[in-house]
Amino acid sequence: MENTIEALTGRIINGEAITHAEALELSQMEGSALFPLFCVANRIKEHFVGDKVYLCSIINAKSGRCPENCSFCAQSAHHKTDAPVYSLVDEDKMVACAHEAEKNGSSCYGIITSGTSINKGEELTRICRAVKRIRQETGITPSCSLGIIDYETALALKDAGVETYHHNLETARSFFPNVCTTHDYEEDVETVRVARKAGMKVCCGGIFGLGESIPQRVEMALTLRELDVDSVPLNFLNPIPGTRLENAVNITPMECLQTIALFRMILPSKKISVCGGREKNLRDLQSWIFFAGASGTMIGNYLTTTGRAAEEDWQMLKDLNLSAANCCD
C-alpha cells in the first residue's frame, strides 16, 4: 500500500485528482498503515499551501431558538439544552470581539448567527455596519456565517467588506436526512454557489461522528471538491446533553487524523482547518493535526462550547516550530 500511496502523492502534486475508488481505498487503511498516509498528506499540504498555520476565531452573535432540527446542535429549538439564548448582539459587541480575536493572533474573524437565516432588515444592516467598522478599526479579515442566504444578501455582505462566507454542508448528501429534515441539502449547496457568485470566498465543511460511515466522509469531500470551495473546516462531534446525539460515542484520535488526511488527499490545495471538538476527540494528539494535512485551526471558544486558552495553542505552535499565516495569503 505504501507504494500506492507514493504513486498517488506524485500524481496529486503534479495536479491530478484522485478518483472516488482511490479515496475509498485510502479510507480503509488502519493501524500502523496510517502513518505513511499522514506523512504524504503533510507533504501535499506543504507543497500546495506551505507549512504556516491559519488561525481563526468566531463570535456567537445570535444564539439559540433555531427552527432547524440538526441532530448535533445545542442551539436547535427541538432540543432542551443549556445553550445560551439571545438575540443578535449589538454592533459594538461584534467589533469588540474582533479586536480581541486580533489580539489573540487570529487573522480571520467570523460573525456566526443561529437560525435558518437572518432577516434582511435590522439584522443584516447591523452586521454590515459591524463588518465595515471591523475593516476600518482592525487588521483582521471579517467573515460571516448567517445561514441560508440569497444573492441580494450575499451582495450586501460583499459590499460591506465580508471576505469569506461560511456555510457548512455538515455531512454527505446521502446521510443528511439522518441529521436534518427541516431543510434540504440542496439549499445548503445553493448557498455556497450564491456566495461565490457574489464574489466572496467560501468556507465550507462539516462535522464528523454523527453516525456517518467513512465512505460518506469521502462522499462529502468529493462534493466540496466539485463545489471548489476555498477553505474547509473539519469539526468532530462533542456530544451535548439534550441533543439527539447526546449519547454518541466520540471517534478515536486516529480516526480523526485519518479523516484529516483523506480530506487533504482529495482537496490538496485547500485550506483545511480543524475546529470544534478537537480537544474532546483528539486529546493528546491535537498537535498531530498539522502533520496529517491540516493547515489551520480555530482558537478561542466555539459556538456553545469552550475552547482552550489561546496561549496554549500558541505554545503548541511554538513547540512544533510552526508560525501563523494571514488567512488572506
UniProtKB/Swiss-Prot annotation:
Pathway: Cofactor biosynthesis; biotin biosynthesis; biotin from 7,8-diaminononanoate: step 2/2. GO terms for biological process: biotin biosynthetic process. It comes from the Bacteria. It catalyses: (4R,5S)-dethiobiotin + (sulfur carrier)-SH + 2 reduced [2Fe-2S]-[ferredoxin] + 2 S-adenosyl-L-methionine = (sulfur carrier)-H + biotin + 2 5'-deoxyadenosine + 2 L-methionine + 2 oxidized [2Fe-2S]-[ferredoxin]. Residues 48-278 form the Radical SAM core domain. Belongs to the radical SAM superfamily. Biotin synthase family. Catalyzes the conversion of dethiobiotin (DTB) to biotin by the insertion of a sulfur atom into dethiobiotin via a radical-based mechanism. This is Biotin synthase. It comes from Geotalea uraniireducens (strain Rf4) (Geobacter uraniireducens).
